[in-house]
Amino acid sequence: MTTPTTAPSGCRSDLDSRYHRLCDLAEGWGIALETLAAVGAVATVACMFALVFLICKVQDSNKRKMLPAQFLFLLGVLGVFGLTFAFIIKLDGATGPTRFFLFGVLFAICFSCLLAHAFNLIKLVRGRKPLSWLVILSLAVGFSLVQDVIAIEYLVLTMNRTNVNVFSELPAPRRNEDFVMLLIYVLVLMVLTFFTSFLVFCGSFSGWKRHGFHICFTSFLSIAIWVAWIVLLLIPDIDRKWDDTILSTALVANGWVFLAFYILPEFRQLPRQRSPTDYPVEDAFCKPQLMKQSYGVENRAYSQEEITQGLEMGDTLYAPYSTHFQLQNHQKDFSIPRAQAPASPYNDYEGRKGDS
């Protein structure tokens, strides 16, 4: 006769043992992480509603084009917080495929959206025509679909179509190595996003560089989190019972990094008025162009004469309200004498008469 297992402190006696970490007071990390994940999920949903509300508040059309990709990004963040519960619950035939498939797919969605945003900012900061919202969204979805194909292929080959318990049956070192190898494409996306964001700082329209900083700093913190959990997961000296704790902590930490260092700063920029320093080249035709000031019709004959005589512009006097022809080298100027009437031949007529 088997004795029933006693429920840990804080859990009901009839609760399945797979869910004991959600309420076990002795293992407080499960309760702490599920609380942070739940709060993060609620905050993400609130951000999604706020994003829909801000659509009519965004005055800059170039910022409005990013809203569909940012909404997709929030869906990925919501999935990251939700996936945390799959790592708090013990590994079995249901949580195993969920972990291996969704971990890479959700992060691929997030980093693909950041990479598409960085590509659009590179054009804007250089004054070029920005990408349309459909192109930005297509880039984000296209980059993330690669990880979907990789994850599906791995699951089909590993489970042999029907064996869903294979992940719990694998040795822990082998399972961790496969898990990390499955995420190589996500690591490439993350590093590519980080280095691409540096190109946003090379441009004349400085108003867009703030958005590039949000992407750069978010990618940097994400890389630090990923390096930490990968190293901890692959160290053989650590007790394998902490694997789920390490992965669930990485999920919660990265989810809050996405919210705190990308979403919230971007939301602060959305309702702001359009600044002249943010104008791309497509608005250049609205700006007045400087024209060369001209004081008359140029005569190439006189211009050529000035060149042949070797006259300098410093010797030219400009007199306002005068004609185009100005006095040059005024020290050698001379006056033309007035015309005088010739003497009449009859002035000496009377004198000639007296002589005769």
UniProtKB/Swiss-Prot annotation:
InterPro entries: GPCR_3_C, RA-inducible_GPCR3. Disulfide bonds: none annotated. Glycans are attached at residue 160. The modification Phosphotyrosine is found at residues 318, 321, 346, 349. Pfam families: 7tm_3. Keywords: Cell membrane, G-protein coupled receptor, Glycoprotein, Membrane, Phosphoprotein, Receptor, Transducer, Transmembrane, Transmembrane helix, Tumor suppressor. The modification Phosphoserine is found at residues 303, 344. GO terms for molecular function: G protein-coupled receptor activity. It is found in: Cell membrane. Induction: By all-trans retinoic acid (ATRA). Residues 57-68, 123-131, 200-214, 266-356 are cytoplasmic. Disruption phenotype: Homozygous deficient mice developed more lung tumors during 1-2 years than heterozygous or wild-type mice. Residues 1-35, 90-101, 153-178, 236-244 are extracellular. It comes from the Eukaryota. The chain crosses the membrane at residues 36-56, 69-89, 102-122, 132-152, 179-199, 215-235, 245-265. It is a multi-pass membrane protein. GO terms for biological process: negative regulation of epidermal growth factor-activated receptor activity. Residues 336-356 are annotated as: Disordered. Phosphorylated in two conserved double-tyrosine motifs, Tyr 318/Tyr-321 and Tyr-346/Tyr-349 by EGFR. Tyr-318 and Tyr-321 are the preferred residues responsible for EGFR-mediated GPRC5A phosphorylation. Orphan receptor. Could be involved in modulating differentiation and maintaining homeostasis of epithelial cells. This retinoic acid-inducible GPCR provides evidence for a possible interaction between retinoid and G-protein signaling pathways. Functions as a negative modulator of EGFR signaling. Acts as a lung tumor suppressor. Belongs to the G-protein coupled receptor 3 family. Interacts (via its transmembrane domain) with EGFR. This is Retinoic acid-induced protein 3. It comes from Mus musculus. The gene is Gprc5a.
